[in-house]
A protein has these predicted regions:
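Polar/charged low-complexity regulatory segments
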Residues: 2-292
Length: 292
């Protein structure tokens, strides 16, 4: 186990009149995101407890638990600490990095759905609040291909293709809704606009897109959002790449002990993902556009 005690310096979410607009006004989308939160935590806990070696435990049991939870259409986001107590003890700082980025995702959906008249200003404010955190992921464009070339990279998608494609389906949903939400003028139109995406997402849950070779990217699925808010697009893509890295670390036998896994999670987080590393981060793409 891990004996080191980590201070839990959690921040409260950014307070605004638009808080919880998604939950109140577009509950069918909100409940899907609550299911996504469960899926990530349930995966990490099961990977850790099975040593990343037990294919049926992940591909069948843990994946089906997640699909069943999503099917209940949860009204509130789950307590991830209750779902993944072992993982939270192992790498709390990494989990808090996820939590703050997920709160940023939620805030941007709330703003998009709300009747807030100055949406750009609201997004600028919530982004500034996010960047003020010690757990902020860099808003610079990272070289995802280099970040996918560690010795243990691709271990998760190779061993667990179904759950990997399920995770990528979550990431599809998270970024595909931005352009339709922003283009639709009123709540009725927004509700209609996300329905085809929800239908595609639910189809992916039933038949995971195992043919995909890389995670979905914001600029591919919501190009107008990415052009308007490039820093947000980078943060969300980097968040999703960090998810892939941690899944690989938890799966790979190259890092046989929990201590080794924890050390590598924190090495990668501190060196390549946190905005606090921007001055020295070798994974930042300099200047040019970066496409997959």
């Amino acid at each position: 186990g891990c004996s080191q005690f980590e201070p839990r310096d959690k921040r409260f979410y950014y307070r605004a009149l638009w808080n919880f607009s998604l939950r109140e006004d577009l509950a069918e989308l909100d409940s899907e995101f609550n299911g996504v939160d469960f899926g990530h935590s349930n995966l990490y806990e099961n990977l850790l407890l099975t040593g990343g070696q037990d294919v049926p435990a992940i591909e069948e049991r843990a994946r089906k638990q997640t699909i069943a939870f999503i099917a209940t259409k949860p009204r509130l986001n789950p307590n991830e600490e209750a779902i993944a107590p072992t993982y939270m003890k192992l790498a709390w700082r990494a989990q808090n990095t996820f939590d703050e980025a997920h709160a940023l995702h939620r805030a941007t959906y709330d703003i998009a759905v709300s009747d807030e008249p100055e949406k750009d200003r609201a997004i600028r404010n919530v982004l500034a609040y996010y960047k003020d955190s010690a757990y902020a992921i860099t808003s610079k464009r990272l070289d995802h291909h280099r970040l996918d070339q560690f010795p243990y990279s691709k271990a998760f998608r190779t061993r667990f293709p179904l759950f990997n494609a399920t995770i990528w389906s979550y990431h599809y949903l998270q970024v595909a809704v931005y352009d339709p939400l922003q283009a639709a003028r009123d709540l009725a139109a927004k509700t209609q606009a996300v329905r085809p995406i929800l239908a595609t997402y639910r189809r992916y849950l039933e038949q995971p897109p195992v043919q995909w070779t890389f995670m979905p990217l914001t600029a591919e699925l919501s190009p107008q959002f990415a052009a308007r808010y490039p820093e947000l697009a980078n943060i969300f893509d980097n968040l999703h790449m960090l998810h892939d890295n941690i899944s690989d670390i938890l799966t790979s036998e190259r890092l046989p002990t929990w201590e080794a896994k924890r050390a590598e999670i924190y090495r990668v987080l501190n060196s390549y993902y946190l905005a606090s590393a921007d001055a020295t981060n070798p994974m930042i793409v300099q200047g040019q556009e970066h496409h997959h």
